Curated annotation (Swiss-Prot):
Single GO MF descriptor: nitric-oxide synthase activity
Binding site for heme b: 186, 477
Assigned protein family: Belongs to the NOS family.
Source organism per UniProt: Sus scrofa (Pig)
Calmodulin-binding: annotated span: 492-512
UniProt name for this protein: Nitric oxide synthase 3
Keywords associated with the record: Calcium, Calmodulin-binding, Cell membrane, Cytoplasm, Cytoskeleton, FAD, Flavoprotein, FMN, Golgi apparatus, Heme, Iron, Lipoprotein, Membrane, Metal-binding, Myristate, NADP, Oxidoreductase, Palmitate, Phosphoprotein, Zinc
Amino acid sequence: MGNLKSVGQEPGPPCGLGLGLGLGLCGKQGPATPAPEPSRAPAPATPHAPEHSPAPNSPTLTRPPEGPKFPRVKNWEVGSITYDTLCAQSQQDGPCTPRRCLGSLVLPRKLQSRPSPGPPPAEQLLSQARDFINQYYSSIKRSGSQAHEERLQEVEAEVATTGTYHLGESELVFGAKQAWRNAPRCVGRIQWGKLQVFDARDCSSAQEMFTYICNHIKYATNRGNLRSAITVFPQRTPGRGDFRIWNSQLVRYAGYRQQDGSVRGDPANVEITELCIQHGWTPGNGRFDVLPLLLQAPDEPPELFALPPELVLEVPLEHPTLEWFAALGLRWYALPAVSNMLLEIGGLEFPAAPFSGWYMSTEIGTRNLCDPHRYNILEDVAVCMDLDTRTTSSLWKDKAAVEINLAVLHSYQLAKVTIVDHHAATASFMKHLENEQKARGGCPADWAWIVPPISGSLTPVFHQEMVNYVLSPAFRYQPDPWKGSAAKGTGIARKKTFKEVANAVKISASLMATVMPKRVKASILYASETVRAQSYAQQLGRLFRKAFDPRVLCMDEYDVVSLEHETLVLVVTSTFGNGDPPENGESFAAALMEMSGPYNGSPRPEQHRSYKIRFNSVSCSDPLVSSWRRKRKESSNTDSAGALGTLRFCVFGLGSRAYPHFCAFARAVDTRLEELGGERLLQLGQGDELCGQEEAFRGWAQAAFQASCETFCVGEDAKAAARDIFSPKRSWKRQRYRLSAQVEGLQLLPGLVHVHRRKMFQATVLSVENLQSSKSTRATILVRLDTEGQEGLQYQPGDHIGICPPNRTGLVEALLSRVEDPTPPTESVGVEQLEKGSPGGPPPSWVRDPRLPPYTLRQALTFFLDITSPPSPRLLRVLSTLAEEPSEQQELETLSQDPRRYEEWKWFRCPTLLEVLEQFPSVALPTPLLLTQLALLQPRYYSVSSAPSTYPGEIHPTVAVLAYRTQDGLGPLHYGVCSTWLGQLKPGDPVPCFIRAAPSFRLPPDPSLPCILVGPGTGIAPFRGFWQERLHDIESKGLQPAPMTLVFGCRCSQLDHLYRDEVQDAQQRGVFGRVLTAFSREPDSPKTYVQDILRTELAAEVHRVLCLERGHMFVCGDVTMATSVLQTVQRILATEGNMELDEAGDVIGVLRDQQRYHEDIFGLTLRTQEVTSRIRTQSFSLQERHLRGAVPWTFDPPGPDTPGP
């Protein structure tokens, strides 16, 4: 917060008042050249941005259109003229009258807020409340919404019932920031968006006030890297006294009146010094003694609290060239924190709301040290400089003042304490004026306070006319609490030290029970197609509960407008398919891309539409991100803060390096939050499912927790808490879980809805057909499903079907035989967990685990729990505690704690849970462990292979039936859970399923555009729907679409040439112009893959279709094939288009952004083992570097163009 102290400046007239060009509260004008009379200007809803001219002799004049009259404001340096329309929103008259100007008064009576004897009139309060609520909902772009109307009704009802109302937390944050933004006397308002708001409205005593203030000082000081902050104590309530801070600033130096009438210390603080002494303070006798605080709770006498020395950062003053300057013994404190002003928001008054920023150097060097009624060192310094002080024409005052200011700047910079010089501050204010003119049509400003006390006309603000008016929310002056009607109880109270307060907090059980609401709030957001990200987010929540007040939310449950009022956000997300957001993160991603950042004003179309260009690009350039990072590095506390100026964030991405866009969505969120002004606390964390994902998350989570604790000055035992959360000793304990019999379980479909949190539907099998030859050792099946016309199963060609399969019966029965305490076969059970109690809070209690609905154990293992995937290190750690054989216990512990050992074991064996139990037979397996610790059985996704126009009421997935042996082909036979089950189904069998739309993988609306389709193996699946749709267009609609080109690939023409007859029929009927097939294992023929066909036979066509005819290319298949095709297309475009390879990559990025290069990528297949092994080796290397500390978690994250996903 730049120079917030100027809002509550030291008493006394500001300097440089006589020759202003400002339009004051009464419209006063400078004497040199009278400003023109106000002209007609646009209405407030359509403010005009200022137009600057290159030189004063060629001024720019905005034409005043018809409308209400508004002040015309001129910049006399450049000649530009603007109209301040924002002033029309002012509801309060200034102190000036038509006959007199009071703009130079420091404390005009009209601008002071005095406590009224009774509550404010209800209608007056309601009017102010409505205005503020309207402002708030307009700021979040929800004006006129149902939530807006309901909030207005809620406020009206509360005022009618109680005579007042209360702000929501987001409303308070918005109001506090707006009050700073509206402060006419503050020159550093460009950073208004970075104000950190601490909500202390639950405070009930002076002791708690002191605790909050200590936290404020510690946070804001930040070891010298000052941060703007405000702490808001309870609002003024009718019939009750106020919370007040008697000191004008949280840190002030004492002023001792001497017998000869002089003052030792700061003369501005003589009165508060004497009050502190009256209330029990034992004074020193120095020039720079830090005053204690006098804090007052409602209807109580003030209490004295001494600030601990370690809390107050002070800077000894020295000069860069004048060595004698240090001997003067001067010093000043780092943190300017105004504490005697009132915050008004929507008619509500907060008499205690200390706020802090950082100093502008002239406030210390000119005002505090040189003013005659302050430390008055000017002549002493001049004498030391051998200046002639006998005559003013020697300019000794100016010379000495400059050197003192130089000493202040030098000393603060040497001590690494934030400070800003008056030239930088005023330049930033001019930028702020420009921003505000564009955003709001004006900016209230008091010229007499904005112009610094030295270098007046050398700064740009001197030449800028300003309009001064009062907006709400606002900071207002108020009478000192010991004077007049504000005085209440000045009895002497015993002083309390910081140590006493700290001890009281530690030992008070009742206080500890209410600590959580006072903690810094943190939002933990997750998005994933599975529950992995949710599980990690919940672990993160448990960790952050040690020192914060966290809430864990799915992205689709989170209102993105809340980001502007957040303090700390942690994101855990996966990436879906081709670098896209998971389905439950799509709305969050869209809203995030739409938000505007500090350097771009409003979102430009190329920024919020270019997600794929910026974060999924195959080239090595991202000009937008590079430009942003340059500006970010060059930015300072005189730059605009951005929409998310107060946000601190950390992001962790989940994914697989086998995919070309590894963690692309996580990188997008990480980059976008920074662009919008947020502060990254920790580099982007990335967890590779191919190796060490859980270990990577643990390391990142601990580092994120520690960084957050350091940032917010909480959790001194952060490292210990983080280690404790992930310690093996915190493993699953059977005594904390118990089973409870349930009357009746749910049907299957409602249970799946409960577990997967999405609508489910039941389709019925019509037929299952093997598409491969009977001579083939493999199987690929076409499953025809009857949707029975259910609306939720409607789809378009290119969409996916999600299917929820059961586990194999034999596997379930074998596992049940290993359970030590099986429940009766027909008894539905639930699991209850013992929740710990808290001192002064509720006692321990048994709480039902909501993860699974009540089912029999057999049903749970069959339909809901994953028993085929290799157990995670976390689960192995639990199993180690249940092993009776010491050697097995040791081996399980090793696997759970050694990432490389675990990954090698998992990769070689790929064991099911049953195989793990066979390897470690002494492990006991209690039922609660299975129901609470096993991962959930996830849906399997398949491309839809049909068109509803051709097969109404049907869905056709094409599925490769998976079967393989582990341990280099010598291990047990494993079966694909879903594919094997689908292959065994009979007509009439039910299939629980749902549709996942794939809007980026659909035929273009214009059928005249050429398309190239590339899909080997089951990659042909979505294209079957495409050709059926085109056949329908030709034969039912009479259209003549451009013939498509199909590139298919398989092993052998006689074994696995899928849909050959259908494709030939479609070609004969005009759907395809060309059909080319690549055979990788055709007898007596060389191996050929689809990318070979593209390179040797279709290069010219690929370039023509994509670059000249605005056509489309669709690629469907596994990640390795898709990557090879992408690289081939890039080389083709470079060769055929005569461009560099990077340029061709940029072209593909544009094609993706225009949705003309489409990819539908599915996971690893057996033939990608070599590639996957290489990727795992790379991931191991990176992971081990992290664990050794060679790659710390705190360096700048790689850009979105980093090679590898």
